[in-house]
Structure formats: C-alpha cells, structure tokens
C-alpha cells in the first residue's frame, strides 16, 4: 500500500498539475477527489502546453489509470469537450475512469451561480461561474443528480423534471430571470452521458484494489488549502475540501491508506478573485512578478493578485493538511530582484501573531512582518541541482523550508518536467 496526496498550500495555481505530472511517472493510478472544471492545471510535455480543467494530469500516461472520484462535481459538457481536445491532440483516454457516485453539474447550476454572484453586488466572492457551488448545494440538500442517474434515462428524466421545476420557480420569483426548458437540457445531457458511459464505474473499488495490491496511487487535489470551505478564507473559498482529508471522502478510501502529503507552493503567493491576501503587492514589484510569472487564471484568464511568500499561510496549510513534504515552484520568477521578502508573522493591532485568523475583520487589520533576504540576478532556469543555484537563491529555498517546518522534496525553476529538481524522492521514502 503506497499512496501520495498532492495538495495546493496557497490559493490555488501553485503548479499542482506540473508536480502531479512529475510524480505520476512513478505512480500506477492517479485520482482527483474534489472540485470540478473550475480548476485549471497546465502540463508541459516536450515543450508543448496542455491545459486541463477536469481530467486528471495522469491521463498523459496511457499505461496508468486516471480516476475522477466521487467527490468531484462533473460538468458532462465540459468533460466531453475536454475528451475531444485530448483526442485531437493524439492523447488516448482509454485509461480514464469516472465515479458513478460523482454529482453532475447542469445548466441550472451555472445560471444560479451567475445570478447569485450578480445579486451580491460589491460583496462578490469571485466565483468562476462554473456552477460548482450550486452543484455542491444540491448534493448537500440530497437533490443532486449523480453520474449513475444520468445514465438511466427514466431516472434522469424524473429527477431533472423535479429539480428544474424548483429552480425555475427560483429564477422567476426571486431573480426575475428566464426559466430553462426541460427538453433541450434532457436531450443534450443524456447524450453526453451516453458518450462517457464507457468510463463510468465504482472508482472506490478500483482505488482500494490498487492500494491493497501494493500499487502506487497518487491523489491530485484541485484549488488549494486556503480555498478549502472549512479551513480557508471563508466565505472567499470553494465549495469542497481540497485539504488532504478530502481524499477519504472524495475518493472512497480510508484515512489509514494515506502515506504522504506533498504540499505544493510557489516561491511567492497569488490568488484569483476577492478575499483576504495579507502580503499582496500593488507596486512595480508585484506587476513584474505577475508578468514574469504569467499570472493569469487558466480557467478565467483574469489577472491574478500577487504577493510575497507568506509562511503564516504555509504553516496553517501544513497543520490542517498534515503536509509531510514540500514542493517549491517558480523560484525563477524572483530572479532579477535586488531583495526578496518572506512574511514570517503578522502584526494584529500591535501584537505579533503567527497564526492565520478566521475573522475577516482581523485579517483586514493584519500587517505582514517581513524578513528580507538578498536577491539574485542570475538566470536559474537551467539549474539542475540545489548546489547549482546561486547562493542567495539557495539560502531562500532553505529559509522557506525552515519557516514552514517541512522538508523540501523538489524545487522547480520553470514549467518543464526537466526543470523540476529532486532533493528527496517522495515515493522512495514511503
């Protein structure tokens, strides 16, 4: 039994897809356990970029099984489109498996997402308008439609009719919006179900059988710990649990079967959308990091907010997700800066604190306390070991590990597979 969980430790966009792709080389099964097509991950293979939103990064390894677990909310339209994209690129998807217990995103979820966000006015939370939240709402309310239901024509028709009637009353009475028609949705989405049914199965059985057989299983999280609905900057969060604990619920494996948790972070911080961000930069340095790091959302295309590395956030993520190893990405983006800063604590009303407050009002008053380190001017994109890094960059990497309190297993100096440097093999240490 050998398993590794990959989680984002910031607000998403940390490079989880790249690290999952890297670790997938030694895995036999790769599984997603939460989120939906609101997540975006970019994988670079032989210099070519592939952008995925729903299908696990392991799909590029035809001999390995890629799993969409029961905790994922699946938009069949997006899934069929992504499958077609991969097929057009010559990528086989015969190794994909989709949980029959995963819930389905339907057009009324997306419409409701938009209406709810518009109604918030200046209090928007920055949703991607993908219907993720409303789909999880239906799941919790026990009125959701699962993949298993989508494949059964009579059950799908019955549940869609009931749900659509309820949602249309909401659209008309509360939001003064146009109702949706049953026939078009039913025909379109039932057809999508038939297109994907070859991949549908009980993925909990596949995952547990693999673990019991001693195979290496890699669990791939979406978003990040700071977007977790319980542990993140609520309400500016996603509607699921990206923390490592989400694996057990979202994939159907027990907690005793998790061996390692790899936390992925960037050498700085970024986030898309609204919400607290203590180390956010509004100056030329911030703009430089955004441009050099190409900090624009994979899903939305929106410019990401950027800031200095926040070790307070990272220690929070380490604690609530049980992180055992750290993967530090995008060190190259900081090249050329005379000084680099790391937030080591916050000043809250004149008191130094080293924890991340739950209160949004307190977070507004938190001022980052920085430790300044000398920067480096060298181009490090060709570095292939820690010793090859300039001394100042090497010191930065070491200081990050010290402040977070987790050993760094890999560091990356660019988006390519070959730009990921191993300090300690995660698989070998299990």
Curated annotation (Swiss-Prot):
GTP binds at residues 12-18, 40-42, 304, 330-332, 412-414. Keywords: Cytoplasm, GTP-binding, Ligase, Magnesium, Metal-binding, Nucleotide-binding, Purine biosynthesis. GO terms for molecular function: adenylosuccinate synthase activity; GTP binding; magnesium ion binding. The active site is at residues 13, 41. IMP binds at residues 13-16, 38-41, 128, 142, 223, 238, 302. The keyword Nucleotide-binding applies. Binds 1 Mg(2+) ion per subunit. Its EC number is 6.3.4.4. GO terms for biological process: 'de novo' AMP biosynthetic process; IMP metabolic process. Pathway: Purine metabolism; AMP biosynthesis via de novo pathway; AMP from IMP: step 1/2. It catalyses: IMP + L-aspartate + GTP = N(6)-(1,2-dicarboxyethyl)-AMP + GDP + phosphate + 2 H(+). Mg(2+) binds at residues 13, 40. Substrate binds at residues 298-304. The keyword Magnesium applies. It is found in: Cytoplasm. CDD domains: AdSS. GO terms for cellular component: cytoplasm. Its cofactor is Mg(2+). Belongs to the adenylosuccinate synthetase family. Homodimer. Plays an important role in the de novo pathway of purine nucleotide biosynthesis. Catalyzes the first committed step in the biosynthesis of AMP from IMP. This is Adenylosuccinate synthetase.
């Amino acid at each position: 039994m050998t398993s590794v969980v990959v989680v984002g430790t910031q607000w998403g966009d940390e490079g989880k897809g790249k690290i999952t792709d890297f670790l997938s080389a030694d895995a036999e099964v790769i599984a997603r356990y939460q989120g939906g097509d609101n997540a975006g991950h970019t994988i670079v293979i032989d210099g070519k970029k592939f952008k995925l939103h729903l299908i696990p990064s392991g799909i590029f390894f035809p001999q390995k099984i890629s799993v969409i677990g029961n905790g994922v909310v699946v938009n069949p339209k997006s899934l069929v489109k992504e499958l077609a994209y991969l097929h057009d690129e010559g990528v086989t998807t015969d190794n994909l498996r989709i949980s029959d217990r995963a819930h389905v995103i339907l057009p009324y979820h997306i419409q409701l997402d938009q209406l709810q966000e518009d109604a918030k006015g200046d209090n928007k939370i920055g949703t991607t308008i993908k219907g993720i939240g409303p789909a999880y709402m239906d799941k919790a309310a026990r009125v959701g439609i699962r993949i298993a239901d989508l494949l059964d024509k009579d059950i799908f028709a019955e549940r869609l009719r009931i749900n659509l009637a309820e949602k249309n009353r909401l659209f008309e009475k509360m939001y003064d919006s146009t109702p949706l028609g049953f026939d078009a949705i039913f025909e379109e989405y039932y057809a999508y179900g038939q297109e994907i049914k070859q991949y549908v199965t009980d993925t909990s059985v596949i995952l547990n059988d693999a673990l019991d057989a001693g195979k290496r299983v890699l669990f791939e999280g979406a978003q990040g710990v700071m977007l977790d609905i319980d542990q993140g900057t609520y309400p500016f969060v996603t509607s699921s649990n990206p923390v490592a604990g989400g694996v057990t619920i979202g994939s159907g494996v027990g907690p005793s079967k998790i061996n390692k948790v790899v936390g992925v972070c960037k050498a700085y911080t970024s986030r898309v959308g609204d919400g607290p961000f203590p180390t956010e930069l509004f100056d030329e340095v911030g703009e430089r990091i955004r441009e050099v790091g190409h900090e624009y959302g994979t899903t939305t295309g929106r410019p990401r907010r950027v800031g200095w590395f926040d070790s307070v956030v990272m220690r929070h993520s380490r604690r609530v997700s049980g992180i055992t190893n750290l993967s530090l990405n995008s060190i190259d983006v900081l090249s050329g800066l005379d000084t680099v800063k790391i937030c080591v604590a916050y000043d809250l009303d004149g008191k130094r604190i080293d924890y991340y407050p739950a209160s949004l009002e307190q977070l507004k008053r938190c001022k980052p306390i920085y430790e300044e380190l000398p920067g480096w001017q060298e181009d490090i994109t060709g570095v292939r070991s820690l010793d090859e890094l300039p001394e100042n960059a090497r010191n930065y990497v070491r200081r990050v590990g010290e402040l977070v309190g987790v050993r760094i297993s890999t560091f990356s100096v660019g988006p390519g597979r070959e730009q990921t440097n191993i300090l300690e093999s995660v698989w070998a240490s299990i």
